[in-house]
Amino acid sequence: MSVAFILLQQLEKSTNIKYTLQKSPIDSRDHVMITKPTVTIYSVNLSSRCPPVFDQGQMGSCTANATACMHYCLQKKSNEFIPSRLYIYYNSRVLQNDVNRDDGATLRVTIASIAKNGVCHETLWPYNPANLYMKPTSNCYTEGATRRISAYASLAIQLAQMKGALQGGFPFVLGILVYSSFVSMSVAMTGNVPIPNPRREQLLGGHAVCVIGYDDSKSAFLVRNSWGSRWGWNGNFWLPYAYATNPNLAFDAWVLYSDNLVASSPNVSVTIPTHPK
């Protein structure tokens, strides 16, 4: 199979994706993560802590895919497992009163569902389109009850705060608006995402991703997508700082924490309060 054919397949896949991410409404009760870096760090790469690249297929489950990636990155490596994405997606839609539709979710609701129902192994509730509208089994909820998160918080759409979270060992989920340039052959081949021109490009919709690093030499964040490992740069892409910190293009940055998860760095002070369930 030729490289060109593979790239054409990936380009076709990206144009058929459901861009269903919904922006979370403002809630004054949200806690905000505050980071205070103590040294200058020019690049961070947490990809070695990531799971294999997910492929969401034709389901509008980008929030669950991004959040499952974030959760995995924070797990203790002696006891790591892939969280069930459809368990997360189903419970998110329950909280959103939209369980019988594949219309996406907000990132706040997605993370809140983990605080309420926890996560379970994907082996218990596999990522199978046949499971999309089915309630997970009781075994899933039994395990999930032992794997709830104790805290989650929003992260300011500000460069210093976003880089500070990564320096502290915290990957974060992020919502972005996707324009037609994002699904170009160039991006599918290189993973280098341009800053869109909203006046000239078609808005395709919202998409949730997991930010796993940054590089000042590129002025960009390293981001894990959920379109398979053949898309972009081994399933990842570089999102310019100017894109990720523009409130007209990016929104809903969230982090999570739990006693059974690990994220720490001696070079950054992180304040993340317990969030009410």
Q: What residue ranges belong to the model's regions?
A:
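General helical secondary-structure elements
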Residues: 25, 81, 89, 143-144
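Non-catalytic, low-structured ubiquitin/UBL-interacting segments
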Residues: 1-49
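Substrate-binding/charge-relay-adjacent region of secreted/lumenal peptidase catalytic domains
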Residues: 30-116
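Predominantly the structural core of cysteine protease catalytic domains
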Residues: 2-18, 22, 64, 68-72, ...
